[in-house]
């Protein structure tokens, strides 16, 4: 009975209070989950799909960074990652806030904002991104129509430039374009520490198995010497990928 009461009480804690209490700056540096990474979040208005592709020298990066819900939007939360921001962003967008309004509210409420990095795309393809002043350099973001790329601890801005160009100039399914963008980012330098994991998540209405749920593509490579190549190989095993991207 006590457990039930606690659960209900916790559910109604205001978002601002909950996020403000998570002050990661007060934690020792070696206890922080730090997803130094590069990612792209995007929307395809023709297929009504939202997706994220991410890679990092971090174990199982997809488990922390990637968040999406069909008809709502997609979110990448990274750097000194606060996983609460993923669901919180989807909840705010589900209530009608656009990408910028959502991001502004989250950042205002988060005590660890200086070491966060977030990319958001909403149900209409509007994007917003934020890079905290204390994210590990090189850190920044680059946005275009229906997408935003962001990264930290990168070899330089050319990583995001290559990702953006790859996404804009490539035709095919959203999953294909996301992975192509990710591969171009790695080719340009990627995470300056190296590589370990990568993930691809694409959602669409009734996109899950037997038209249940929204997970159209959901692939992760959690620990591999060439995670993007392996992610491409796995994605090509399904007909849902719709376009073959060759492992380089």
Descriptions of predicted regions:
Residues 1-4:
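Positively charged n-region of N-terminal signal peptides that target proteins for export
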Residues 7-20:
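Bacterial N-terminal signal peptides
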Residues 22-248:
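N-terminal nucleophile
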């Amino acid at each position: 009975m006590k457990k039930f009461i606690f659960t209900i009480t916790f559910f109604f804690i205001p978002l601002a209070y909950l996020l403000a209490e998570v002050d990661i700056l007060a934690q020792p540096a070696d206890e922080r989950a730090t997803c130094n990474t590069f990612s792209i979040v995007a929307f395809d208005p023709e297929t009504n799909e939202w997706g994220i592709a991410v890679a990092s020298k971090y174990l199982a990066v997809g488990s922390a960074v990637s968040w999406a819900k069909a008809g709502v939007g997609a979110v990448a939360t990274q750097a000194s990652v606060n996983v609460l921001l993923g669901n919180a962003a989807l909840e705010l967008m589900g209530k009608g806030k656009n990408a910028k309004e959502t991001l502004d509210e989250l950042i205002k409420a988060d005590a660890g904002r200086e070491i966060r990095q977030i990319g958001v795309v909403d149900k209409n393809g509007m994007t917003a991104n934020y890079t905290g002043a204390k994210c590990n350099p090189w850190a920044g973001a680059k946005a275009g129509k229906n997408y935003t790329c962001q990264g930290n601890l990168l070899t330089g801005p050319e990583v995001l430039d290559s990702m953006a160009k790859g996404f804009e100039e490539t035709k095919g399914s959203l999953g294909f374009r996301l992975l192509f963008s990710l591969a171009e980012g790695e080719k340009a330098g990627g995470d300056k520490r190296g590589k370990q994991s990568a993930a691809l998540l694409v959602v669409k209405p009734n996109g899950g198995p037997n038209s249940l749920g929204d997970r159209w593509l959901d692939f992760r490579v959690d620990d591999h010497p060439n995670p993007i190549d392996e992610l491409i190989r796995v994605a090509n095993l399904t007909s849902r990928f719709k376009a073959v991207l060759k492992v380089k």
